């Protein structure tokens, strides 16, 4: 059992718990196996009636009782719970009557680091002793939840929230999502109910995004994505979801669940909802039928991939949305194939995407700093650094205006700086927003 971990036949995640395991294994001491409880496996020891129990000659130790049972009485104590728990990997599959099973050894054990020796080490020992093999290949140690004072959550301290109350207030999926998001591998978690709001808001975000897409479906839309009609933003988001799938799979393989969830969160919220969906809104208002159709099919494809990635963490929300999105003969999400990204990247103009984001963000920032109300449109003057940049950004003017709530956007490579303007310097352009009636000059 000791060699199995030292030789990496069994891997710990995170690996630093190997040191704790080795410390216990290298310093094993005698273990009192009897407990005075009402439940458990009664100790298989009988004492001859009317004799001195301290004398081993009066003991009968066996897995079967003595033949003259009327002359013996069994020990009242039961075996320590870990004595029976260490048999769990194979005892639940019919052992000792069943010697082989496809479920032994299993791939992974998920447990807490506080029972490394009590349970993990003893299961490894019993696996080799009774089955001649390791019981599992990987051991993932969960984080320990602590309160804001650093104390372990426990009933005795009364500092553990009622999970049912959290479920009713925030939702089951939101609670699970939030706790996993805040639990980095190998680190304890300082639990705060405020953190559960992140999961609730995320579930609401993906629900609203899915609802928006389905409400904008038209019968005239094509059934598939028109590859020839993809623009740079389409290629960017399709490449981004493939990259997300790759990263999430890598994190799952290394049991870095919080990193996987963070990647899902960042892509869905920041890339898909905050940018691509906003672009799609403009297309649904202004685009032609091909643009609208592609926007719908791409958005639907991406949401479904996100739901598949999300399903192990948020099974209820993901299944409900999936049932609204799936095609007539498509399988339920629980038996659908896990998403795999393509090995090749989808070629797109990354600089154009970055410039577009920076310009829109800069205009929004100025609006916020000047406290311009959302209902008021503004004028923007953009000086491109050169004519090449001007040519690249010209086709995006209407989209920039739409996402920045601007009335006019004058783009040129001229360097005349307008007076009395708010300024933002971007990588590709300098932005000027005439203050005019946007601010009170007397203040």
Annotate each language-model stretch with its function.
Residues 43-51, 140-145, 183, 194-199, ...:
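A glycine-rich phosphate-binding loop feature that marks nucleotide/adenosyl-phosphate handling sites
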Residues 49-72, 95-101, 217-232, 285-293, ...:
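Short, glycine- and charge-enriched coil/turn segments that flank and shape catalytic ligand pockets
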Residues 325-443:
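C-terminal low-complexity, glycine/proline- and small-hydrophobic-enriched intrinsically disordered tails
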Residues 1-219, 237-281, 285-286, 297-310:
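Structured secondary-structure scaffolds
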Residues 164-167, 227-237, 291, 348-349, ...:
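A ubiquitous short alpha-helical element
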Residues 189-197, 221-232, 249-259, 343-346, ...:
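Short, charged, low-complexity loops and linkers
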Residues 22, 124, 167, 265, ...:
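Generic hydrophobic alpha-helical scaffold/packing signal
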């Amino acid at each position: 059992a000791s060699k199995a971990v030292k030789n990496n036949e069994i891997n710990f995640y995170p690996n630093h718990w190997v040191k704790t395991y080795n410390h216990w294994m290298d310093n094993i001491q005698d273990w009192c196996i009897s407990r005075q409880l009402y439940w458990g496996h009664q100790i298989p020891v009988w004492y001859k009636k009317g004799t001195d129990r301290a004398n081993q000659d009066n003991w009968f130790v066996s897995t079967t009782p003595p033949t003259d049972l009327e002359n013996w009485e069994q020990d009242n104590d039961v075996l320590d719970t870990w004595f029976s728990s260490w048999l769990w990997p194979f005892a639940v599959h019919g052992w000792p009557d069943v010697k082989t099973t496809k479920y032994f050894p299993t791939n992974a054990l998920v447990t807490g680091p506080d029972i490394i020796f009590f349970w993990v080490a003893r299961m490894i020992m019993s696996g080799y002793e009774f089955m001649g093999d390791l019981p599992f290949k990987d051991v993932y140690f969960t984080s320990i939840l602590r309160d804001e004072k650093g104390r372990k959550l426990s009933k005795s301290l009364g500092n553990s929230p009622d999970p049912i109350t959290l479920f009713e207030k925030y939702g089951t999926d939101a609670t699970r999502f939030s706790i996993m998001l805040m639990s980095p591998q190998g680190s304890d978690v300082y639990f705060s109910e405020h953190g559960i709001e992140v999961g609730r808001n995320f579930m609401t975000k993906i629900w609203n995004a899915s609802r928006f897409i389905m409400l904008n479906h038209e019968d005239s839309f094509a059934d598939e994505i028109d590859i020839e009609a993809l623009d740079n933003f389409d290629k960017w988001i399709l490449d981004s979801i493939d990259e997300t799938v790759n990263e999430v799979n890598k994190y799952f393989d290394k049991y870095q669940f919080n990193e996987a969830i963070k990647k899902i969160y960042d892509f869905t919220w920041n890339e898909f909802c905050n940018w691509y969906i906003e672009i799609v809104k403009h297309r649904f208002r202004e685009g032609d039928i091909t643009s609208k159709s592609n926007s719908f099919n791409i958005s639907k494809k991406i949401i479904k991939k996100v739901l598949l990635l999300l399903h192990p963490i948020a099974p209820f929300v993901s299944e409900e949305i999936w049932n609204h999105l799936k095609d007539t003969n498509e399988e339920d999400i629980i038996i659908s194939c896990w998403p795999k990204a393509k090995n090749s990247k989808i070629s797109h103009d990354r600089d154009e995407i970055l410039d577009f984001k920076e310009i829109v963000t800069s205009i929004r920032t100025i609006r916020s700093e000047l406290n311009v109300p959302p209902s008021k449109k503004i004028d923007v003057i953009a000086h491109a650094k050169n004519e090449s940049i001007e040519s690249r950004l010209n086709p995006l003017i209407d989209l920039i205006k739409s996402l920045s709530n601007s009335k006019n956007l004058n783009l040129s490579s001229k360097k005349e700086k307008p007076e009395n303007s708010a300024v933002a310097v971007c990588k590709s352009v300098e932005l000027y927003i005439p203050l005019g009636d946007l601010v009170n000059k007397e203040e």
